[in-house]
Design a protein with these regions (language model features):
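Hydrophobic core residues within well-ordered beta-strands of beta-rich domains
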Residues: 20-22, 94, 112, 126
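Short aromatic-glycine motifs in intrinsically disordered, low-complexity regions
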Residues: 5-17
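Short, acidic Gly/Pro/Ser/Thr-rich loop/turn segments
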Residues: 43-45, 70, 121
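HotDog/MaoC-like acyl-thioester-processing domains
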Residues: 1-3, 33-35, 105-152
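Hydrophobic beta-strand-centered segment that forms part of the acyl-chain substrate-binding groove
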Residues: 4, 71-115, 140
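Helix-adjacent hinge/juxtasegments
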Residues: 54-79
């Protein structure tokens, strides 16, 4: 059985890179729960058009942030735990489904935290219940997200 990956090791392996990387930190990583965070870059190009003079982070990017802070790191952790090392390293997690409700907005420069709890895991498929909050604890969005591991 392999040693569990440390959060910083998982963070280094998350494949997304700027400008499409929406996870800065993993504060907690276990078999059933992961906690991650991201600060939205106020200079990000998408804010120029969404919405001019009153910029708001697009909901689709909030969902992507939830996946990068929750589904991807949790899948990496579980694959590392359950698969041969060479196979786990070649596993790519694809985001497959989301059912998310929005209850707030995120402005440029805000930091969000995502708490994801494992709901289902079998045959390289997983589903989490995720919740995104602002630094003050206000819930921005929550719901179920799913992914699957494929060999790359």
């Amino acid at each position: 059985v392999a040693e569990p990956l440390r959060p910083e090791e998982v963070l280094a392996r998350v494949p997304q890179r700027p400008p499409f990387r929406f996870v800065d930190e993993l504060m907690e990583l276990g078999d059933e729960r992961v906690v991650g965070a991201y600060r939205w870059d106020p200079q990000a190009d998408f804010y120029r058009g969404h919405f001019p003079g009153n910029p708001v982070t697009p909901g689709v990017l909030l969902v992507e942030c939830m996946a990068q802070c929750g589904v991807v790191p949790l899948a990496m952790h579980l694959f590392h735990r359950d698969l041969p090392a060479d196979e786990a390293l070649r596993m790519q997690t694809l985001f497959t489904d989301a059912d998310v409700e929005f209850s707030g907005i995120v402005r440029p420069g805000e930091r969000v935290q995502v708490v994801s709890q494992l709901d289902f895991y079998r045959r390289r498929k997983l589903r989490v219940q995720a919740r995104m909050t602002r630094e003050g604890g206000e819930v921005v969005c929550s719901g179920k997200l799913a992914g699957i591991g494929v060999l790359s």
